[in-house]
Regions:
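Glycine-rich beta-strand-to-loop/alpha-helix junction loops that act as flexible
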Residues: 82-88, 116
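Conserved AdoMet/S-adenosylmethionine-binding subsite of the radical SAM
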Residues: 91-226
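Structural motif
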Residues: 21-23, 38, 78, 134, ...
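Canonical Radical SAM [4Fe-4S] cluster-binding loop centered on the CxxxCxxC motif
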Residues: 18-60
Length: 235
């Protein structure tokens, strides 16, 4: 389930994920603080549109909550610890510190990061996330006009910058990279847009590509899911 914004814990789940197995979510960002205001976001509209990295949840609180949860004797412990939630995880200035601590204290768990890719052009961000086992970045378009329609970014973010950051990450990162593409009918599913996305994916050479469509209500009512027939055609 998406985050609602009224949670007091930075942990959520675990949930059984098709992609990851049993996953415990770690949310390091104040609810709906993001670099984008995507029309399809199941957490709702972004209330704090920003590219400024800061500490939202103290490292000590995160590690304490994890210690309590992971040593609580859960009969179905998680397989993966996943950085995600109600905002963009790479906005957390202590992300790298937390990743390093988890790798040291809980090496038995895989780490996963879900990111909208907007801060991957920052070499510091890329260095911080390199120890993560699985990174799932998103790229929904490489067209500036469509990018504004779908993702509604903070100032200074462009699809060219995102793709450049993704390519830098691909060169530097040795873990599993799974590209996520969210399809919005009649916006980024035209033959021209899909051709551009295929070209970008061919350049990136991810370990896998995941096509997603609306599953729950997005932030804008006009966004509709892709039909199973059309999704199959896109694949």
């Amino acid at each position: 389930m998406p985050r609602q914004g009224n949670e007091t814990s930075c942990l959520f789940g675990p949930v059984n994920s098709r992609r990851l197995g049993r996953s415990l979510g770690i949310d390091l960002v104040k609810f709906k603080t993001c670099t984008l205001n995507c029309v399809f976001c199941e957490c709702g509209r972004t209330t704090q549109l920003s590219v400024e990295r800061q500490v939202f949840v103290p490292t000590e609180k995160v590690l304490k909550e994890l210690n309590v949860f992971l040593n609580g004797g859960d009969t179905q412990p998680p397989e993966v610890l996943t950085f995600s939630g109600g905002g963009e995880p790479t906005l957390a200035a202590n992300l790298g510190e937390i990743i390093a601590a988890l790798k040291t204290n809980y090496p038995q768990y895989k780490l996963c990061l879900l990111t909208n890719s907007t801060l991957l052009s920052d070499s510091q961000v890329r260095a911080e996330i390199k120890p993560v086992d699985i990174i799932i970045p998103s790229l929904n378009t490489v067209s500036p006009v469509v990018f504004q329609k779908i993702n509604r970014p903070a100032a200074g973010i462009t699809p060219e910058k995102i793709l450049s950051g993704l390519l830098d990450l691909r060169r530097e990162y040795t873990g599993q990279l799974l590209l996520e593409i969210f399809i919005v009918p009649e916006i980024n599913d035209t033959p021209q847009e899909l051709a551009l996305l295929r070209e970008a994916a061919a350049l990136l050479k991810p370990d896998g590509v995941q096509l997603n469509s609306l599953d729950r209500a997005g932030s804008e009512d006009w966004v509709q899911p892709v039909s199973a027939e059309n999704m199959q055609k896109i694949k």
